[in-house]
């Protein structure tokens, strides 16, 4: 069943599947001591910086937990937007695994600013308070919005000035860079991000993420934290080989650009309908809008999508690398009936 529910619902890109098949031909050493992982590590270092440490993990929550453990101790606090994945959608895993307090901050568009963070930065050195240590941001945000390089640099400078590390959740990072027409390095390393969760599952991979540690002070313990967090794959090559395919020939960019283009087409058609009200600026492959409840109920009979705020009749529509123009046309056609 085709849907606009999530980019997690899409399949695996054929080139990624070919890479998996090639990795499956013969036996290989486990736990990353294989040529496939060696190639993927080299590709990631070529893309970002030779000085990074890439760690392949199973999923997004795992990557976030590994990254945040590297940055914190249990008496620290982690700052994030109130819509952040680590606060809303990870079943308390970051709290359990780090022991840290999470401080959610209200934001109208999913993006944080120094001004929004400033009122929460207190208690430094006070033994009665959790000590601020990590800033978690998403690129794209959970509301589909995108940080510009200027916004990111201002935010990371502010965090570092206050003794905090910056972790970027890049589950949909490709969609952000496709929208801004910038390289992956320009919006991570060059903006002062300390650790990146580099995602691909939502953009054509079968599974897996990569924790990329840029900050040298956080690199030495990374392998041990990954193992302790149950994120070390014995058959590592099936995770790593996907990233080589993903970063070859700009497949990541082509997939994300197509998803963004399909979202733009869907948005353009929806804007023609008087009953549609958008609640967020449409910048990537996620659309947030309000429809009359009877219309939503009727559409759900044929298409699956998620409510974002059921009380307000707000829904989320997500396109992916394999969304077609026919998918968009059929959805709009049904909506107009």
Which residues are covered by each model-predicted region?
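Conserved C-terminal alpha-helix-loop-beta "cap" of PLP-dependent enzymes
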Residues: 74, 264-336
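Active-site phosphate-binding strand-loop segment of PLP-dependent enzymes
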Residues: 4, 112-170
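Conserved N-terminal alpha-helix of the aminotransferase class I/II PLP-enzyme fold
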Residues: 13-60, 83, 87, 93
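Active-site pre-lysine segment of PLP-dependent enzymes
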Residues: 149-157, 161, 172-193
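Active-site C-terminal subdomain of aminotransferase-like
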Residues: 109, 132, 136, 146, ...
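PLP-dependent aminotransferase-like
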Residues: 72-131
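Hydrophobic beta-strand scaffold residues
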Residues: 101-102, 166-168, 278, 305-307
């Amino acid at each position: 069943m085709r849907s606009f529910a999530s980019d997690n619902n899409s399949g695996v890109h054929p080139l990624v599947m070919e890479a998996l098949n090639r990795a499956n031909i013969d036996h290989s050493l486990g736990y990353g001591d294989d040529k496939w992982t060696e190639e993927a590590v080299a590709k990631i270092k070529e893309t970002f910086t030779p000085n990074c440490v890439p760690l392949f993990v199973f999923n997004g929550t795992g990557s976030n937990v590994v990254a945040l453990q590297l940055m914190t101790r249990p008496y620290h606090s982690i700052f994030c937007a109130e819509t952040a994945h680590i606060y809303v959608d990870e079943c308390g895993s970051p709290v359990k695994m780090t022991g840290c307090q999470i401080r959610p901050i209200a934001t109208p568009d999913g993006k944080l600013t120094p001004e929004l963070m400033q009122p929460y930065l207190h208690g430094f050195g006070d033994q009665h308070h959790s000590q601020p240590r990590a800033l978690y941001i998403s690129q794209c945000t959970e509301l589909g919005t995108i940080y510009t390089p200027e916004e990111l640099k201002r935010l990371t400078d502010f965090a570092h000035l206050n003794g905090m590390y910056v972790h970027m959740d890049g589950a949909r990072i490709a969609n952000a860079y496709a929208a801004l027409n910038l390289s992956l390095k320009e919006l991570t390393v060059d903006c002062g991000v300390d650790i990146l969760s580099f995602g691909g599952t939502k953009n054509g991979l079968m599974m897996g993420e990569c924790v990329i540690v840029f900050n040298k002070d956080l690199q030495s313990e990374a392998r041990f934290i990954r193992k302790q967090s149950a994120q070390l794959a014995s058959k590592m090559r099936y995770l790593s080989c996907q990233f080589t395919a993903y970063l070859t020939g700009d497949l990541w960019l082509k997939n994300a650009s197509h998803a963004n283009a399909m979202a733009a087409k869907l948005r353009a058609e929806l804007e023609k309908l008087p009953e549609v009200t958008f609640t967020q600026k449409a910048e990537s492959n996620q659309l947030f809008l309000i429809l009359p409840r009877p219309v939503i109920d009727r559409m759900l009979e044929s298409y699956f999508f998620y409510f974002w705020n059921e009380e307000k009749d707000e829904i989320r529509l997500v396109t992916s690398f394999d969304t077609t123009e026919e998918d968009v046309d059929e959805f709009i056609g049904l909506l107009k009936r």
